[in-house]
């Protein structure tokens, strides 16, 4: 009946489609552990089970073999159940992370740690996998790689890092299948891994091979070559196995291979800037790279390989695939995505037409939305039937009575909680996935063995369609009976003329003769889990219509077995929907934090709490990955509280922004809503269901006492407490539940904050209806309400720590202030925290609070004792009196809102109130800003904005009038004279302002029992007067400062006083120096009542202007100096002017300011000629310019040890080169080598051939990118040349360098290297530069190369003097250009010669002329070639001629026409 499955010749079967290779390898290794070994039939059954199990992949996220085994029916054929049991045992034995190494034996016992304290968070490691085993008795055979094999392996490991468990499993499987040689393994490594990983693997493999060769390997012959060569021989199976094991071990030794590197998966987004992507890579490498691993090569490799395609093209085009990171960043700096702005066009949906649909004939919808199928456009081209499409034509379907199924097309029904409707056939209460069938002529139908599930709540009944061929097909409900040999059908299904035969049937009740008949007509039975009917050649007919049985003859054709799935408890689905966003949508690896031990008392309490949570349905047993520790905490009443330490999960969670601005202000409840009720929810968070995919992040383990056995694993089914997004998620869910209630009762108010709810209504009837609707909605959504804690008027209503009365609000607990001078720091801090909580109802100004806040400052030890001064004790008394009057009014909707702003030296106090009310609505306090100086206009504008924001947010209104304590005169002066940004804000709100002045009794007698100090602030009184124009009769004061000195100049027709002085030792700030210089200048000008002050410091200029308008002084390091300014400026008239420094303008202001700056300048070079030479080794002429005589300079050069050693002649031979006609005309470039301390430097040198100015940079390479970088740096120093001349080295003739020269419009030519005629100048410059470097390193061996090169360039360009022009190279390079000599103008020469000439560029052999030369120069002469133009002609195209005879006289016989080349 069944197919015989021999042992497969293939050593390792292929995995089923959809299952990863490393998972399939675990199943194979578990099968190879069985005794006896598995057969092909076992592998066939395993593959068929896994194929259908992949349609319900809940056991794979993560993989859970126990869950997969529970899905397997009892008595399933083959050894599939045994294979799964091996996997379950192995999974429980392998720890989730390796145990730490045992500590060395200590000399003393470590201190006992508290087992109840949660351990610190430990990073979870990667899960382990099963090792690889060979199949029983099947040796692997060598087979070379093919491209499809390499592609398949690369596809499997594309999502795993080299060295990870998944990577190693796949590679091991490939090694077992193909038995590769050393060359095959090298090809696989180059195909799979990057060059960086391949090089690291190569290093590890070399070290492992060396150790193995030293240790000795069986079969290894040292004389036959290295191990790699011998392993390439397919006959050397033992050596090949040893090499394969070493090759696999090298992966495990890679740095960072213990887990998948997170930085390896960082990819650049399509629109992400390249520098942002590189910054993310750099941060990830800093956090994840093991210590000691070089970061730079990995960063450069990933910066190219993980970049998007556009940036990779840019890097390839510029040759920066593995260049320094700066070059890669510059190459992609200007890259922007092409389609960065996308426009989404949304068209409104048009209403449906009134015409009927042409498909169904009904109006009200478009034809595209019609439920009827689209009719065919015409008759079918195959059968000419107009009722169906060509794809549905019966002629296209082969008329095969029974297609042979595929071996893997097993009809298997695994029980699922929610079957997908598209993948299931329904019938008779059974559920089964569809069978995918293909015709295989070589397959036997007997290999099909479907598993037919039965409904446990009913008998094994199934609905079947029976076609007896004598009547129409009919559907019946039949009993599946494996004990019946034949199928039994009722006689009602057959027609009266159906031929029936008598037969005897032996059943459970005995033998019967007349109850059943036998029909020989074929009967077709269609079962719901089969696509093709069952054909029975004969069956029994029940003449009494009592039985319909599907017997073994029908089931044998199905090749199926019956099984009864285990009864499962139906899940309880809460009415509240699971949140769509939890903060873990990117699904990182769940944390694996070990459970720490608990003492017996705590363990017993934990087990009791877990049992209660399990009964309540909040948790469920769990077997997946992930773990967070748990522990109980005893409360004050003796009960225990369950605590789940979710710190690791919270660190992986993205914060969800809450839409709630905070707790509502209860004073916003109108007095018209007098009827109130509170609702308290029990266990609010435990009503939000948690999606299944997030359970690994909220799993925990309850350990057994003394570790007598494995702990019990649980996971939360609902949102747990301790999760940082739980309050936000619950608040959003509760808001969605209450929103329909708010819309149904617009006249009422529902206040919600977290799980606290307050109902407010104008009448008791409305309150009762609102309460009933709210209660019903909460209960219907599964939120239980605590009836015991419900409060309702008339009665005291306590909500959010406050007591709500009909017309006012008070706090539930007002702190008591003890009056004493000695306080412990925690006591005073706790008292101020409680006062801050009730500050919105405490009638006090900012001053008492600020005084006590200052008492907390300056302490570093929490155990300090604080001693209050008398003013601070007085502040305690003021706060005690204010707290006794703590009360706030409720909002009266018929009255406008009023505001009062009081600016004081300690901060701002803002009050919101309503007229004719006994108490204000709220008191708001704000400290002074942290800036050292804050104009009062800025404070007033900030207070107005804060007041409007608070009233709009809490009351939905703006203050109609705003009172303040600034005088009208001060206010108007600030508006007219200040340029502060707060001026437009004050002008915008000026129509609401009202000045109180000294009117202390109008608004405050009811709020404060004593009059409030609302007089104008003395600090806002202007100290001095600003003059808008300069004062002609007053002197001028200039001051300035640096980090080390300060200076001032007092001038009136001449300098009256000037002084520069150093700063005191602790002060090293330029601002302090500028302020100190101004103070000294004001002190010297104290006798003048008027003064003109000129400052180049913007800080000091704005500070004085703000001080003139009135300001509040904040904290500043210059506070002692700033306190002296009002005394020196009191009652003066000042004109302020800001000067821009270093303008070099000829006006007297700039000159006097420059003179003040000069007082701060310390001479840069205060060296004697000998000291200068010892530092720079400059030449003799440079020393004479620094004050030395010629003899002294010569003696200094002779006495210098470094100069005698490296350059005895004290000069370099001159080179010969065609020089430029002006600066930046022609440059010469070269790369010279300089070796120092075993480091070879490449000096890229550029020389201007006109001035000799040099630019040099030290590099480590001679690539084109380095040459381009050095040229750009030279251009930044010397300017852009017109021509550059280099040798024909690879760096200079590369395409990149030539393209760069073309883009900069620079003409590039080459010369012969080391030729004194063509490259003499740059070679001489190289010698001068290296000679100076040798001198510097002789004197100072530890001098850095960069510093030595900078000193050498300074010496060559700025100090050494050229003998032919007595200028330095820098002076000559920046000297003004000479006027050009025009060639079109006739020039008169004192000495004239006549020449025959040939024009350059022409091949004519005829001499022209003679012509008289207009001008002669070295190498050429200016010859008039026509009547209007002249041209310079070189000597090689000239020959001298005698002066021609005058026309009127005979020729002198002595004169000869001697001609020669010039």
From Swiss-Prot:
Active site per database record: 481 (for protease activity)
PROSITE patterns in the record: ASP_PROT_RETROV, ASP_PROTEASE, INTEGRASE, INTEGRASE_DBD, RNASE_H_1, RT_POL, ZF_CCHC
CC per GO annotation: viral nucleocapsid
Zinc finger (CCHC-type): 355-372, 378-395
Residue span, Integrase catalytic domain: 1219-1388
Keyword vocabulary terms for this entry: Aspartyl protease, Capsid protein, DNA integration, DNA recombination, DNA-binding, Endonuclease, Eukaryotic host gene expression shutoff by virus, Eukaryotic host translation shutoff by virus, Host gene expression shutoff by virus, Host-virus interaction, Hydrolase, Lipoprotein, Magnesium, Metal-binding, Multifunctional enzyme, Myristate, Nuclease, Nucleotidyltransferase, Phosphoprotein, Protease, Repeat, RNA-directed DNA polymerase, Transferase, Viral genome integration, Viral nucleoprotein, Virion, Virus entry into host cell, Zinc, Zinc-finger
Motif (PTAP/PSAP motif): 124-127
Keyword Zinc listed: yes
Required cofactor(s): Mg(2+)
Pfam family, one: zf-CCHC
Region (Disordered): 93-143
Residue numbers binding Mg(2+) 3: 1230, 1287
Phosphoserine PTM sites in chain numbering: 105
Protein name per its UniProtKB record: Gag-Pro-Pol polyprotein
